[in-house]
């Protein structure tokens, strides 16, 4: 799998991913003398930054963080590369001073700690040679402000028993909108669904597979659904109720992307 990213600090590097799911401060969050992660909230406390491709949403804290990054690199304890969802000045300055390749606009959902990866900041690319990607559509149908979610059957190939939107694989060069319409018809029996919006893709990992999820929002005139073999149960919910369900990874992110997506106009 490969990701298109934006260069912040130039260079190329390889390493094993170390992924923190929360904003990170190098000041207080790491030991400047050992490179050990100290921040409990990071989820990777006790790991060492040295020679790792360190990924996190964005930086926080003091401007001293720039010099902390530089100091780690001078001691040979710094990360081989830095990957972020959104770059900030503190980390960017530190990466430039330290000569560490840095990129942003990275969907961290594509990465797991332990992934082998290479970063080509100059080419705007991150490669994950051990990860396969699958393109899927996930559709949310809406009626009077509530969204349909379904519980996946034990007969499907992934995420059995989890709650999801209406989903299906894209094959070859199939048009995502066409597949979305087919999935709604096949999995709900609703024929008059009206396409409203298409969201920004969201990446969700399941071990060695990364699912590139393309979100869609349809409006429907009924809450009466006829499930096929892929799903065994359905609910109409508000988005703020999603935490009560054992859902597939990043379902709320996919739902929000669909709701905030670009409007699809007829013709």
Predicted regions and their residues:
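Conserved Nudix-box catalytic region and its N-terminal flanking loop in Nudix hydrolases
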Residues: 146-186, 190
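Feature captures the catalytic cores and cofactor-binding loops of soluble hydro-lyases/lyases
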Residues: 3-10, 17-125
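Conserved N-terminal beta-strand and adjoining loop/helix that marks the start
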Residues: 130-148, 167
